[in-house]
Amino acid sequence: MDDFSNLEKHESELGAFFGDLAFEEDSRSEDISLEGLQQELEECESDEVVANILSSGDKLREYAKGVENNLRKVELDSVEVAILLPDYIKESDKLVSLHDQIRDCNCILSQMETLLSGFQEEIGSISSDIKILQENSMDMGLRLKNRRVTESKLAKFVEDFIVPPKMIHVIVDGEVNEEYIKTLGILSKKLKFVETDQAVKSSKALKDVEPELEKLRQKAISKVYDFIVQKLIALRKPKTNIQILQQSVFLKYKYIISFLKEHGKEVFMDVRAAYIDTMNKVLSAHFQSYIQAFEKLQLDIATSNDLIGVDTRSTGLFSRSKEPLKNRCAVFALGERIQIIKEIDQPALIPHIAEASSLKYPYEVLFRSLHKLLMDTATSEYIFCEDFFGEQSIFYEIFAGPFSVIYEHLDSVLSSCYDAIGLLLMIRIIHHHQLIMSRRRIPCLDSYLDKVNISLWPRFKTVFDLHIGSLRNANINTIWEDDVHPHYIMRRYAEFTASFIHLNVEYGDGQLDINLERLRMAVDSLILKLAKLFPRPKQQMVFLINNYDMTIAVLKEAEPEGGKIQMHFEELLKSNTSLFAEELLVEHFSDMIKFVKSRANEDSSPNLERSITVAEVEPLVKDFGSRWKTAIELMHKDIITCFSNFLCGMDILIAGMTQLLLYYTRLEDCIKKIDGGSALNRDIVNYQSIMFEIKKYKKTF
């Protein structure tokens, strides 16, 4: 607005100076009059604006143009103002009202500011009061906490220190039951409190309470000792189930032992010794009676005469009557005795039930049953001792007696045991029992089982050496029989060896393999000596083949895949089979074989002194053609007679006929090279005929 008024002022001044001059018109216009110009200029000298223009030296036209532009701008602004001015005037009442409201608000806010300032001062005062109250509250809380701690300690002290009348009544007059055990626990805590708490030792009340606690301790110890002794007496009664009594009575009151350990060490040692003595005697008697009972069930398998190389055929009637009952088939053969390994974890035999059935058992069955009973008893006792007494060493003191009883029994049995198979079965049983105890994680029988194992192996080695010695020292003249069928000693050997191979399949015992090899060498030597007693080589070979074949068949049952020993006898069988087949052919076709081996080979030599002629081979061809079938039939009958194993005999016959075909083929080849040999073609047996005969026997086979 100020700029607008200034512009109007300048315009009026210029109007007064220039009149109604239009700036857009050209000053050079001829219509403009210059009269009086000097006078007007003089009059305007005193004007400040004009003086400034003239003094600055600006051109009048340029200045006028600038003024014109300013005027136009002012004109435009005035137009905008003129447009907005009516709206402004229209809303002026509202603006006035708004101005009044703002003024009223300022008054209200000023009042509120004053009020809040007052509140702030009051809150500051209250905050100080609260802080004081908070400090007082914390102080009171700390004092309350200290009082409660003091009260708690004092209450606990009083509770741990005093002896309630009810506790005295239970300890002195009560029966030993669950309530009594709980009261013992309370008494134990009080005794420990008096012994260990320094505050109690300096307390004057100790003089009043300590004598009473000591009386209660002595009474409790006396009472629980009598209780335990009565239960130990119950263990000694015949037919008492020890394990049930331990589980239902002793373990139920096992805190008594803990109490005695802490507050009656001497009495605890007496109880411990009494339990050890009781259980030692009870278990020793138990195992002693069990051993005596199953000795009646024992089946004696072998004696000192039951060795592979010992001739037992000549035993007289009177000497037989003195021998114990034995299963002759089980002396050298494993048979059904292997079942004991498969039934290793079966329950122990009950003697009176087994005796009622009138059954007898090989010793390894009784051995397993005895050790099954020992394992179960030892496992139960070991766990009980650890749970009841809290120590493992007590077990070994208890079982010193039972171990001694069993050791004594085993020593007496092993010293007279000649059953090698039974001994190895017992060794395997011990091995499985060690595995069972390992799975149970019960180590209490480790040293015992090791000791038994150490006792078994030397005896087994001794008996095994006796068998080897019996073969080496056998009197061949006594045991020899004029029979080419398998010898009874070789059958014993085969069954004996097969038994040990079977028992060693899953164990791979190298020491046993060495002993079996020693046994094989001894029987090899013996069987060759027996074979040489036959007058004819053919009989010797038949005897050896029959024995080797039987041995292989027995060994295959024990180890179908074939082991080192079986392979050895297979090689011997193969070599003797070839020799026998050759011997059989020589017996029936000696001339032809002799010719083929000597003269047929000469035919290929360039330096011949004497050529083979038709006359030389013609008798051979005609002889073979006339009787070859008959000869094969005789060979067949001979083989059936000689060999107990039909399959083995057929193998030998087929091998012999195959060899015969080879000899005859070589003879034919020789004839083809002889001058005039074609004349013998009508007498030659063709190849197909011989093959047909071989196939015929193969079909029979």
Swiss-Prot record:
Q: What InterPro entries does the database record attribute to this sequence?
A: Vps52 (IPR007258), Vps52_C (IPR048361), Vps52_CC (IPR048319)
Instruction: Name residues in a coiled coil.
Output: 23-45, 511-533
Membrane topology note: Peripheral membrane protein
Job of this protein: May be involved in retrograde transport of early and late endosomes to the late Golgi.
Write out the GO cellular component annotations: endosome membrane; Golgi membrane
Broad class of where this protein is predominantly found: Golgi
Q: Which organism is it from?
A: Arabidopsis thaliana (Mouse-ear cress)
Q: Which gene encodes it?
A: P2
Tell me if Transport is a UniProt keyword of this record. yes
Q: What is this protein called?
A: Vacuolar protein sorting-associated protein 52 B
Q: Does the keyword Coiled coil apply?
A: yes
Family, according to the entry, reads as follows: Belongs to the VPS52 family.
Q: State where the protein is found.
A: Golgi apparatus, trans-Golgi network membrane; Endosome membrane; Golgi apparatus membrane
Transmembrane feature ranges: none
Q: Name one Pfam family in it.
A: Vps52_C
One Gene Ontology biological process: protein transport
Please give the subunit comment from the record.
Component of the Golgi-associated retrograde protein (GARP) complex.
Question: Which key words are in the record?
Answer: Coiled coil, Endosome, Golgi apparatus, Membrane, Protein transport, Transport
Tissues/organs with expression: Detected in pollen.
